[in-house]
Structures are given as structure tokens and as C-alpha cells.
Amino acid sequence: MEAAAEPGNLAGVRHIILVLSGKGGVGKSTISTELALALRHQGKKVGILDVDLCGPSIPHMLHAQGKAVHQCDSGWVPVFVDQEQSISLMSVGFLLENPDEAVVWRGPKKHALIKQFVSDVAWGELDYLVVDTPPGTSDEHMATVEALRPYKPLGALVVTTPQAVSIGDVRRELTFCKKTGLQVIGVIENMSGFACPHCAECTNVFSSGGGEELARLAGVPFLGSVPLDPQLTRSLEEGRDFIQEFPKSTAYSALTSIAHKVLHQMPALCS
């Protein structure tokens, strides 16, 4: 029988969710960020652990770049990104002297930081910890899953885009989840059509429906499609809360629906 982990800094975290993608450029960090914001607007207290060590973009998306990480008796204190302190964030981006500095580290150093992020960040009480992972399936993913395994993460959200290349990569991601014993909470298709900011009509730019079909064939839940939305893009670039500012947008409806589905699955996932 596997030994129980010391609860430590994750003792107050109720649910841990990983966000994965088979390839880069599909908007995985966007989904992580907006899911956290949507859960916050549902009254949940959320933390984001950014383990995308070579591409830490979430501090910029949440207008938190340049903020300092402080030490306490329990370890690192995450950065709060709102006045209510309902979203906290830890990222390697806070540890770099220059935000444009490239992270050129060998595997052992990356693995050590991932383990430190898991054990040494004083999250306090959280309803959800969203873990934004690098794209693909690599040693960093193995290190993340192994470090979190004793704390029984709920599972993974897998992000794809409609194109066939991305769908193929997601098949490999689903295989990774199966081999590592990580439950798939669901598949999210991002960049699914273009939402006009004036009339809200959604036009397919790429093929559509690939993510839903893949989820059906794999026997995992399909959580929804998020369109390309200029208002969402602008919010991320400016570090603004899209969920709060654009409640009438098509992407808002899609993102809040996904958050509702995740919340609805909680009883089954926890059983």
C-alpha cells in the first residue's frame, strides 16, 4: 500500500486539477487562467501553479508580472492577483530577474523546482488548485504527476484545437493519462470558430467538432468548445478579468459552462 503523504502546504487544498495539451499553441494557459477566473466567480478560492517552466505566461495574463514572492515559515507565499485574495499564483516567472530571461535548465534542476513548487508553496485554504503544465508529454509531466500523486489530484483537463494535427497530439496525451493513472476530467476544444465581437455570430475558421468526436471515441467527457474571441485575446494581453468584463460574449458563455460542468462532476470524481 502506498504511504500517505505528509499534508504540509497542500493540507488546505480540496481539489487539484491538471491542465494538459498535446502540443503548444492551443491556448492551454488561456484555459487554465479563464477556468480559475470562472471558478472564482462561482465563489471558489483558487490557486494556479504554473509549471510551464520554459514559457511562464500566466503572470502576464493576470497582470501579476514583476510581483515578488516572499518567504514565510512554511515556504514561499504565492502572489495574490486580486484584492479579495481569491486567486493566488506561483510561477517560475516570479523567480527570474528578467522576465525575458530564457530558462535553460537540465532535467534534474527542473524536476527539483517542480517538487519544490508542490511541497514548499504555502497555499493556505483553497477550493481548487489548477496546475498549468508544459505542452506535450515529457519528463516534466512525469515529475509533476509523481510529485502530486500522493495528494490524489482529481484528474486532468485536456485542451485541443479543431485541427487534425492537434487532435493526434491529444490522443497521445490521453494515452499518457492512462499510463500514469491520471483520470481525464474532460476534453476542451479551444479556438473553435471565430466569435464576432459585434454580433456574437460564430464562424468556423478551422474544421470543427474534432475535439468532441475524439472525446466520444475515447470514452471521456467533452466539456465544451471555446471560440476565438477578440475580447478574450485583448483581456489576456492587458491582464484583465475577461469573465467579469464581458459577460455577454460567446466565449464567456463557453468558459462558464465548462466551469459549471467541472463543478457538477465533483461528487463523481471524489467518490
Swiss-Prot record:
Binds 4 [4Fe-4S] clusters per heterotetramer. Contains two stable clusters in the N-termini of NUBP1 and two labile, bridging clusters between subunits of the NUBP1-NUBP2 heterotetramer. It comes from the Eukaryota. InterPro entries: Mrp-like_CS, Mrp/NBP35_ATP-bd, NUBP2/Cfd1_eukaryotes, P-loop_NTPase, YlxH/NBP35. GO terms for biological process: cell projection organization; iron-sulfur cluster assembly. Keywords: 4Fe-4S, Acetylation, ATP-binding, Cell projection, Cilium, Cilium biogenesis/degradation, Cytoplasm, Cytoskeleton, Iron, Iron-sulfur, Metal-binding, Nucleotide-binding, Nucleus. The modification N-acetylmethionine is found at residue 1. Belongs to the Mrp/NBP35 ATP-binding proteins family. NUBP2/CFD1 subfamily. This is Cytosolic Fe-S cluster assembly factor NUBP2. The gene is Nubp2.
